[in-house]
């Protein structure tokens, strides 16, 4: 019985079925198995309407007539239009007659010359030129103020000299290995030299305040390099790249946590003056050749490897010693008077650092860590790491 009712779902109801109750939605009645809504014809049949049609009475067919335009009405209008056109024709002919025949244009006396020298010609073509990176230190009106500011900040951002003695699980040799690895990272991702200098500064300042186990030293270096990249680079590598370079020794969460810890320890003071910045300042005040500049940068980076003895010197002093030694090696010139006036450093001020740097330069080829030396063998830096150090200094 239930199956039969289901099969009768779409069968129209009998003629005598009552109409649907008021208030129910008929559209949902079919879905619920209720009676279908009767059509207008069936409703009229039940109400007794249309009986004449049901009795077989035939209605007369009807036609729709469309009035044709009255031709007689249009004729006077057309005649009036033709009369007006005929009246205007003589005036139009007279107007055309005054113009006369069309004559060719006479050539211009002075033809416009479209030469390359014409100011009306503008070259709007786009030429691709190598854009030089602007030097933020090269502001003549503020050079003195910038140098004074850097000298003040280098004292505030200086790491503690003997912090490694208080580290229970790491040594200067481990730090040297870490910095050497960061040099390779910088070359791999084509980072700025300033990024490397900043990262080493962050590491030394962090280790001056926090004890670190040797298993976490690389994590500190990775997070410091990440911070320096964000501070200095236009397009810093992603965090995943820094996780990758550690051979997945640490995960992304660990790197970000260490980055957060370094920021807290450094009190978010990331704009630390570096040797690289002071060298840039010196190059602006004392013009020199590209080889001297590259050798100065090479000597400055060599001091990043060894915490002892270079942590006891300010970056401005190390930069002065590097400039003097590079200039002496290439050109035979010593500390110039122009830089003496700008920095206030005499040769006696930089002499202790200069002696230490000279010893480092002499032993660079025998040093265990060779990444910096390999870096400066390239033509980009004029292969200055292959230049032999002078045996003695004329001080």
From Swiss-Prot:
GO terms for molecular function: cyclin-dependent protein serine/threonine kinase regulator activity. This is Cyclin-A2. One of its GO terms (cellular component) is nucleoplasm. The lineage of its organism: Eukaryota, Metazoa, Chordata, Craniata, Vertebrata. Cyclin which controls both the G1/S and the G2/M transition phases of the cell cycle. Functions through the formation of specific serine/threonine kinase holoenzyme complexes with the cyclin-dependent protein kinases CDK1 and CDK2. The cyclin subunit confers the substrate specificity of these complexes and differentially interacts with and activates CDK1 and CDK2 throughout the cell cycle. Its main location: nucleus. SMART domains: CYCLIN, Cyclin_C. The keyword Zinc-finger does not apply. Residues 27-60 have a biased composition (Low complexity). GO terms for biological process: cell cycle G1/S phase transition; cell division; G1/S transition of mitotic cell cycle; G2/M transition of mitotic cell cycle. Belongs to the cyclin family. Cyclin AB subfamily. It is found in: Nucleus; Cytoplasm. Keywords: Cell cycle, Cell division, Cyclin, Cytoplasm, Mitosis, Nucleus. It holds the Pfam family Cyclin_N. Interacts with the CDK1 and CDK2 protein kinases to form serine/threonine kinase holoenzyme complexes. Residues 1-93 are annotated as: Disordered.
């Amino acid at each position: 019985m239930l199956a039969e009712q289901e099969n009768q779902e779409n069968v129209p109801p009998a003629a005598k079925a009552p109409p649907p109750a008021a208030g129910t939605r008929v559209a949902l009645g079919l879905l619920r198995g209720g009676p279908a809504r009767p059509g207008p014809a069936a409703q009229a049949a039940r109400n007794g309407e249309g009986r004449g049609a049901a009795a077989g009475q035939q209605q007369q067919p009807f036609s729709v007539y469309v009035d044709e335009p009255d031709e007689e009405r249009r004729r006077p209008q057309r005649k009036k239009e033709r009369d007006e056109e005929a009246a205007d024709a003589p005036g139009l002919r007279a107007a055309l007659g005054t113009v006369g025949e069309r004559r060719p244009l006479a050539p211009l006396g002075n033809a416009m010359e479209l030469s390359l020298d014409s100011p009306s010609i503008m070259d709007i073509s786009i030429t691709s030129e190598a854009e030089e990176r602007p030097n933020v230190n090269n502001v003549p009106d503020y050079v003195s103020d910038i140098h004074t500011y850097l000298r003040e900040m280098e004292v505030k951002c200086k790491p503690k000299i003997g912090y490694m003695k208080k580290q229970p699980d790491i040594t200067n040799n481990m730090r040297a290995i870490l910095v050497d690895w960061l040099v390779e990272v910088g070359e791999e991702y084509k980072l700025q030299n300033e990024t490397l200098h900043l990262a080493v500064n962050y590491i030394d300042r962090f280790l001056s305040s926090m004890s670190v186990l040797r298993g976490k030293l690389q994590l500190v270096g990775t997070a410091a390099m990440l911070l320096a990249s964000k501070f200095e680079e236009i397009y810093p590598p992603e965090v995943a790249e820094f996780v990758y370079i550690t051979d997945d020794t640490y995960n992304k969460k660990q790197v970000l946590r260490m980055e957060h810890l370094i920021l807290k320890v450094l009190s978010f003071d990331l704009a630390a003056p570096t040797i690289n910045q002071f060298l840039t300042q010196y190059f602006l005040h004392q013009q020199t050749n590209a080889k001297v500049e590259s050798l100065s940068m090479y000597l400055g980076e060599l001091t990043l490897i060894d915490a002892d003895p270079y942590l006891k010197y300010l970056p401005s002093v190390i930069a002065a010693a590097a400039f003097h030694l590079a200039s002496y090696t290439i050109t035979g010139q010593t500390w110039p008077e122009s830089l003496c006036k700008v920095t206030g450093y005499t040769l006696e001020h930089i002499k202790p650092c200069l002696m230490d740097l000279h010893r480092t330069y002499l032993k660079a080829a025998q040093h265990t860590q060779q990444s910096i030396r390999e870096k400066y063998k390239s033509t980009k830096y004029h292969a200055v790491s292959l230049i032999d150090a002078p045996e003695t200094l004329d001080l």
